[in-house]
């Protein structure tokens, strides 16, 4: 009988998954990770927490489910541009549990800014404008695979985020109007990894925009975006991720940050709220997890 690899094993029932994740969860020291691990930051742009949770529970995202449960967190912005400025500065989606400012846990910390200007002891502290550039300073090759138009480099605004990285890539086939955009983005990511020495540490950011509007084409015979097509886009993206994770595993140890930057609305409450760019519970509540490959 063939021995199954860990990634081929069936997902345990959700209560057992919860138990296992909580039992093995430890507070991270990013100073032990930086320099020894590749770092992969994937943003599932526009993903709602409630949809992520539903797909997690019904088994619609088997790849992501292997790496623990989504946490319910607060978005750092209500659309892509402000959210990414915050995240690249180290302010990732935050816990919704009441926590004093000075006791908040951070993976990356900008020196001299807030929280008493003292870095949490287990955070990677940096002087640069972004933690991406902070990682570059300590020897990382930094790579951006763009998705939505804020990463397209086709306008002055679309060049701001790519300029934070040593290497940045975008082409129309990575855009949110292309159903196969995650396949195309991952193909480019793997190409970059194959051109990189194994001993060279990589920090890669990918802005997956499959879930961003329009997403109706992930359901047959549909011409309008909805919560159902939002979920279908997430399932499509999840099925693509195994190739990406396998490529990183070949290089050695990898630390992964996976989250949404903001959620979105579909007028499902007949309240007139459509998409995002405003404060609404569906927009400001996002899924987050980090894990090791």
Q: Where are the regions that the model predicts?
A:
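Catalytic domains that recognize anionic headgroups
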Residues: 1-293
